[in-house]
C-alpha cells in the first residue's frame, strides 16, 4: 500500500513554526488596525469565470496555473490563485459601496497555483493583501506602498528595493503594445518559446520574461513611459512625490509590469536584495477598471499582496518569540487526587491561568520531569498526603521553593498565585 504523504507543493505548518506565522499575523493586524483597515475573509474557491474575466484569459495564471475543476453539480470551480478578485466580488455582491464608498480592507489566507515548487514558492501558499477601494487619489497608492514597507520594517526586513512604474490606461497600453509588438517581431526567431507565444496575444507580458537573451533584446525596446497620457503622467508624478515625502526610496523601472491584466497606472514590486531564492516579496498596483469589469459600479482601487512564505524566509531570524511556558502543571497520584486535579485545572483556566494536567499515570518523578520539560512556572502536586489533609503543594520550578496550603485557601489566593507566576516568569530560563 502506498504511503500517504502531503501532496507535492504543499507543506504542513507544525506548532513551533505556527508561532512565527501567528507573530506576523498579529504584528500586521495591529499595524493595519491603526490605519483603519478592516479584515475580510472570502471563500477559497470561486466560479472560474471570476478569474477568467478578472485576471485575464491570456495570463499564465489562467492558462497554466489554476486549480480548476467541475464539482458534483458540474459547476466550473477554481481554487483561488490570488485574493483581489475575490475581495472585489464580495465588494460588489454585498453592495459594500452603499455602506461606504471608501473601503479599506485586508486579508490573509491560502492561495493555489500549479507551479514548480521551490524555496519560498509552494502550490498552496499564503498571501497577505491590502486593498484601498474607492479612491483614485495618488495618496491612496502611496499609502498602500508605505503600509507594505512598514510591515517589512516592523519585522526588521532590510535591504529592500521598491521598483515602481506606470503602465498607463488601457488606451495608452494599446498604443504601446502595438509598437512593442512591431519591435519584437524583428527578433521573433531569437525570442524564447514563451515570448513567441505571447507576442500575438499579450506582448506586454514579454517584459516579465526571465530569459536572459530575451531581456537583452528588450533593452532597446520602446518604453511605456513614452506612451502615457498627461493624466497618467500626472498621477505617477504625484505618487512619486508622496513617496518622497514619506521617505520611501524608490527606483523607476520602465519595464515593470504585473502578471495580472487588471492593473492600470501604478505598478510596483518590493524586492529583497540579499534573497537566496525568489526575491520579490510584494507586488501591487492600481486596478480602476476591475470592479466595473466584474459587474459593479465604476470604482477606482489600489492594492498589494505579500507572499507570506517568502516573508517568513527573510524575517524568521529577526523574530524573537517569547519563551513558551506553562503557568501551572498539575501532577497527581490516586483516584481522588485525579478527580480534584481535573477540577483545579478547570478552575485555573477559568481564571486565565495557562494550565496543563498530567494524565499519564506515571510516577511523580516522571510527571515532574514533564513539568520541567514544558517550562512550567509552578507545579501543583496532589498526592496521598495532600488528599488526606485536603491541601495542595505548590512547587516553584525555578527556585525549587515549595508552599503548602488548603485547597480552599489556594482558591482564595488566586490573585497572589497569578502575581507570583508573573514574577517568576522573568527568571524562567531553566
From Swiss-Prot:
One term of GO molecular function: histidine-tRNA ligase activity
GO biological process entries: histidyl-tRNA aminoacylation
A Pfam family of this chain: HGTP_anticodon
SUPFAM superfamilies: Class II aaRS ABD-related (SSF52954), Class II aaRS and biotin synthetases (SSF55681)
Cellular compartments per GO CC: chloroplast
Keywords from the named record: Aminoacyl-tRNA synthetase, ATP-binding, Chloroplast, Ligase, Nucleotide-binding, Plastid, Protein biosynthesis
Major subcellular site: plastid
Compartment annotation: Plastid, Chloroplast
Catalytic activity: tRNA(His) + L-histidine + ATP = L-histidyl-tRNA(His) + AMP + diphosphate + H(+)
Enzyme Commission number(s): 6.1.1.21
Keyword Transcription annotated: no
Superkingdom classification of source: Eukaryota
Protein family according to the UniProt entry: Belongs to the class-II aminoacyl-tRNA synthetase family.
UniProt-recorded name of the protein: Histidine--tRNA ligase, chloroplastic
Amino acid at each position: 500500500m502506498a504511503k500517504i504523504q502531503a501532496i507535492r507543493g504543499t507543506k504542513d505548518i507544525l506548532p513551533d513554526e505556527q508561532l512565527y506565522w501567528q507573530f506576523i499575523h498579529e504584528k500586521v493586524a495591529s499595524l493595519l488596525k491603526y490605519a483603519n483597515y478592516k479584515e475580510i475573509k472570502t471563500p477559497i474557491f470561486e466560479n472560474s469565470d471570476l478569474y477568467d474575466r478578472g485576471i485575464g484569459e491570456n495570463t499564465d495564471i489562467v492558462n497554466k496555473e489554476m486549480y480548476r475543476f467541475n464539482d458534483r453539480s458540474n459547476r466550473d470551480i477554481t481554487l483561488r490563485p490570488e485574493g483581489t478578485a475575490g475581495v472585489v466580488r464580495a465588494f460588489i455582491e454585498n453592495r459594500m459601496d452603499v455602506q461606504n464608498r471608501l473601503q479599506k480592507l485586508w486579508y490573509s489566507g491560502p492561495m493555489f497555483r500549479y507551479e514548480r515548487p521551490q524555496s519560498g514558492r509552494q502550490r498552496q501558499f499564503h498571501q497577505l493583501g491590502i486593498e484601498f477601494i474607492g479612491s483614485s487619489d495618488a495618496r491612496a497608492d502611496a499609502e498602500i506602498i508605505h503600509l507594505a514597507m512598514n510591515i517589512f520594517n516592523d519585522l526588521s526586513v532590510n535591504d529592500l528595493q521598491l521598483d515602481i512604474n506606470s503602465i498607463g490606461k488601457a488606451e495608452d497600453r494599446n498604443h504601446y503594445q502595438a509598437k512593442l509588438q512591431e519591435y519584437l517581431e524583428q527578433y521573433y526567431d531569437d525570442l524564447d518559446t514563451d515570448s513567441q507565444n505571447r507576442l500575438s496575444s499579450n506582448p506586454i507580458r514579454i517584459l516579465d520574461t526571465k530569459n536572459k537573451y530575451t531581456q537583452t533584446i528588450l533593452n532597446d525596446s520602446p518604453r511605456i513611459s513614452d506612451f502615457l497620457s498627461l493624466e497618467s503622467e500626472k498621477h505617477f508624478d504625484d505618487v512619486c512625490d508622496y513617496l518622497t515625502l514619506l521617505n520611501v526610496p524608490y527606483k523607476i523601472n520602465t519595464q515593470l509590469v504585473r502578471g495580472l491584466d487588471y492593473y492600470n497606472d501604478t505598478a510596483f514590486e518590493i524586492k529583497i536584495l540579499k534573497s537566496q531564492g525568489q526575491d520579490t516579496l510584494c507586488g501591487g498596483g492600481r486596478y480602476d477598471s476591475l470592479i466595473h469589469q466584474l459587474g459593479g459600479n465604476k470604482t477606482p482601487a489600489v492594492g498589494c499582496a505579500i507572499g507570506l512564505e517568502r516573508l517568513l524566509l527573510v524575517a524568521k531570524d529577526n523574530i524573537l518569540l517569547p519563551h513558551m511556558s506553562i503557568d501551572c502543571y498539575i501532577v497527581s497520584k490516586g483516584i481522588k487526587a485525579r478527580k480534584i486535579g481535573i477540577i483545579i485545572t478547570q478552575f485555573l483556566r477559568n481564571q486565565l491561568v495557562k494550565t496543563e494536567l498530567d494524565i499519564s499515570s506515571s510516577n511523580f518523578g516522571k510527571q515532574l520531569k514533564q513539568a520541567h520539560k514544558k517550562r512550567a512556572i509552578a507545579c501543583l502536586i496532589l498526592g496521598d498526603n495532600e488528599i488526606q489533609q485536603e491541601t495542595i503543594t505548590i512547587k516553584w520550578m525555578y527556585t525549587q521553593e515549595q508552599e503548602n496550603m488548603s485547597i480552599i485557601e489556594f482558591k482564595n489566593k488566586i490573585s497572589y498565585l497569578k502575581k507570583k507566576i508573573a514574577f517568576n516568569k522573568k527568571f524562567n530560563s531553566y
